[in-house]
């Protein structure tokens, strides 16, 4: 690998690599913790030298704080000495007796694994920077949230929304290709079940387990099996516009419908029913409305279900699956916008005290594990092509964020066999985007948000990537042409 490309690869996947490879993560954390402790020792000595009156109590506090720092520094130094820079970054270091002794002295009663990496992870969790500063009475003051910080929060929220939207579209694309069934449901909360819902923090988790096990039974499998290969879901919370009442929109994607599922329009003169009764009764806290999602070439048509009609008796307009996917993502965008609203605004609209308790909680978008992250393997691609895919933009693929994440994961695996010192030699400087933008605002009279952020990130247009990278996107079926269709109608109703 060329030196320039290798440096760019490490810079591109640095955050992924430190999260994936235990040896590299520990080396970085040991270095950061060593710098932190040295800085705290300096601050402690400076504070002591500035004391005008030293009584016995002050000296005792100083001695205990100094002893605490010495214990932590001894553990950090010993762990640093055990790191083998010649070993690969995915290597796991065996335990050392002295490290174990120091760890048990600092973290008594805390269990740890069979490697030094697991012991170090437990130490960092038990003693974060905030706790050490609290013990030394050196807590950092809360930073003021200025215009830059508020703008960065909005940008992060927008990025999360776009990422979830792309994951939903990709998951539904994969489920359609596999011939799965789509069910759109709305979960509500009944007044007489609000107390039971408030008392059960795992109500939603239990509901999705119930549906997953129903699918397993329909396939003749044990309910103890994992249902990730036959059932996927997305759940988006929403607050009603009129009264602020909490409810959820759910998309079920199942390989096999639960037992008892049948065409609701079979034998009817007017085929205007779409509810699937086999999904009802699984949510014990209110009402549900599970609706079969119908579109062109769906699994229901292959199963022989009749095509439904609308309220006027006309056959429903046939849309491609992409339209359904884009329609579902509007709920994700809407929920993201609603997070900006204050909880008090929701509570003002709500007259039920039990519902007001629900509104105090923070409900997030829930989904199956690794929802929408599946793409064709990138193991055969070169590091140069992977680096290009990790920098693509929307005009190359509407699922550009998923492509970028998968490319970075593959690059992270590719560099896993390299020695630690080779990676650390090209370690990138981690800069704070917040501080960088603040500095640019002071230097630039006419500051532009978008151009400044764009200049800090490397992105490639469709014409800038190689033919091999472009061919991968085409073969994966995720080009803008493949995902062009958008929804123009509502897929709800009976």
From Swiss-Prot:
Keywords: DNA replication, DNA-binding, Endonuclease, Hydrolase, Metal-binding, Nuclease, Viral DNA replication, Zinc, Zinc-finger. A zinc finger (unnamed) spans 230-252. It comes from the Viruses. It holds the Pfam family Phage_GPA. The keyword Ion transport does not apply. The active site is at 327 (o-(5'-phospho-dna)-tyrosine intermediate), 331 (o-(5'-phospho-dna)-tyrosine intermediate). One of its GO terms (biological process) is viral DNA genome replication. GO terms for molecular function: DNA binding; endonuclease activity; zinc ion binding. The keyword Zinc applies. The A protein is a specific endonuclease that cleaves the viral strand of supertwisted, closed circular DNA at a unique site in the A gene. The A protein also causes relaxation of supertwisted DNA and forms a complex with viral DNA that has a discontinuity in gene A of the viral strand. This is A protein. The gene is A.
